[in-house]
C-alpha cells in the first residue's frame, strides 16, 4: 500500500523540457513541493548541472547549494530539488550572475541572463482575488504568493510587478487588447505577441487571439496568457528569437543563411 507522497521520478517520466537523456540513469530528480507544479518547473539541480554546467554530479550541486551561494527570488535556497519556475530570478552572488527563467519558442526554459537592475523585480500573473478574514482583500499569484491589500484596480489575469526585496507590488499591467503577452502553456508555449481580442465563453474557456511581431496570429486559452508589458514594450528581457516561432522551412533558411555568411 502506498503511504504518503511519491518520492521518486523515473527518467522517462520526467518532463520533456528538462532535456534529460534516457541512458544516463534510471531516475531523475523529483522536484520538492513548492510554488510551481512538477510539470512546469525546473529543479535547481537540473539548472546548475545540465544547463549552466557548473557541476558534473548531483553531489557537486549539493556542495554548491549548501554553501548558500544560490538565491531564488532573493531568498537563499539550499534544497537541490527546489522547483524554480516561470519568471523566477536565480542569482549566484559568487559569480555576480542573475538569470530569469522564461520559455523559448520550443517550450523549454531558456538560460536568460539579466542585469542587476532587472533582477530586483519579477512579474506575477494574478490567479485569484479573494476577501479574507475581517474583510481584508487578498490576491494570489501564479507562483503562490499571497499579497494583502492590493490596489483595487488589479483584477484576475492582470500582471503585477513585485519588488523581490520587500515582496510588495510596485506596478501592474492590465489584461487588455494591445498589450504584449507570453504564452505559458499549450501548443503555443513560449510565443510572444500582442493581444488582438478576447472571446468570452461563459461556462467554458475564454479564448484569446494573439498576433506576433511577424504578423502570424494564433489563439489560446486565457489561462495560458501572461501579460509581460504595456503596449508592445515588454518589461522583461526576452530570450533569443524574441518569442517568434519560425516554421521548419524558415528555420532551415535561417540556418543556411548563417552557414553561407560564416562560410
From Swiss-Prot:
Gene Ontology MF, one: rRNA binding
Superkingdom, taxonomy of origin: Eukaryota
Keywords: Ribonucleoprotein, Ribosomal protein, RNA-binding, rRNA-binding
Keyword flag Ribosomal protein: yes
InterPro entries, per database record: KOW, Rib_uL2_dom2, Ribosomal_eS4, Ribosomal_eS4_C, Ribosomal_eS4_central_region, Ribosomal_eS4_central_sf, Ribosomal_eS4_KOW, Ribosomal_eS4_N
Cysteine pairings via disulfide bonds: none
GO biological process: translation
Domain S4 RNA-binding: 42-104
KW Signal (keyword) present: no
Cellular component terms (Gene Ontology): cytosolic small ribosomal subunit
One protein family per Pfam: KOW
HAMAP family named among the record's database cross-references: Ribosomal_eS4
Similarity remark: Belongs to the eukaryotic ribosomal protein eS4 family.
Listed name of the protein: Small ribosomal subunit protein eS4
Gene name linked to the record: RPS4Y1
Amino acid at each position: 500500500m502506498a503511504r504518503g507522497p511519491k518520492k521518486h521520478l523515473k527518467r522517462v517520466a520526467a518532463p520533456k523540457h528538462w532535456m534529460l537523456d534516457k541512458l544516463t540513469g534510471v531516475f531523475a530528480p523529483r522536484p520538492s513541493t513548492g510554488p510551481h507544479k512538477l510539470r512546469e518547473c525546473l529543479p535547481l539541480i537540473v539548472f546548475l548541472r545540465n544547463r549552466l554546467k557548473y557541476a558534473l554530479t548531483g553531489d557537486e550541486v549539493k556542495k554548491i547549494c549548501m554553501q548558500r551561494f544560490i538565491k531564488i527570488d532573493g531568498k537563499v535556497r539550499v534544497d537541490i530539488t527546489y522547483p524554480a519556475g516561470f519568471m523566477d530570478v536565480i542569482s549566484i552572488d559568487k559569480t555576480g550572475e542573475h538569470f530569469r527563467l522564461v520559455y523559448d519558442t520550443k517550450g523549454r526554459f531558456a538560460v536568460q541572463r539579466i542585469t542587476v537592475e532587472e533582477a530586483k523585480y519579477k512579474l506575477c500573473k494574478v490567479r485569484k482575488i479573494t476577501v479574507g478574514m475581517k474583510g481584508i482583500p487578498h490576491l494570489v499569484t501564479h507562483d503562490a504568493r499571497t499579497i494583502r491589500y492590493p490596489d483595487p484596480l488589479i483584477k484576475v489575469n492582470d500582471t503585477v510587478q513585485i519588488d523581490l526585496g520587500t515582496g510588495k507590488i510596485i506596478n501592474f499591467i492590465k489584461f487588455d487588447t494591445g498589450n504584449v503577452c507570453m504564452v505559458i502553456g499549450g501548443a503555443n508555449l513560449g510565443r510572444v505577441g500582442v493581444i488582438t481580442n478576447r472571446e468570452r465563453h461563459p461556462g467554458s474557456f475564454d479564448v484569446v487571439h494573439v498576433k506576433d511581431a511577424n504578423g502570424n496570429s494564433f489563439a489560446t486559452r486565457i489561462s495560458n496568457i501572461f501579460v509581460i508589458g504595456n503596449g508592445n514594450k515588454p518589461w522583461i528581457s526576452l530570450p533569443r528569437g524574441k518569442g517568434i516561432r519560425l516554421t521548419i522551412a524558415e528555420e532551415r533558411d535561417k540556418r543556411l543563411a548563417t552557414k553561407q555568411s560564416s562560410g
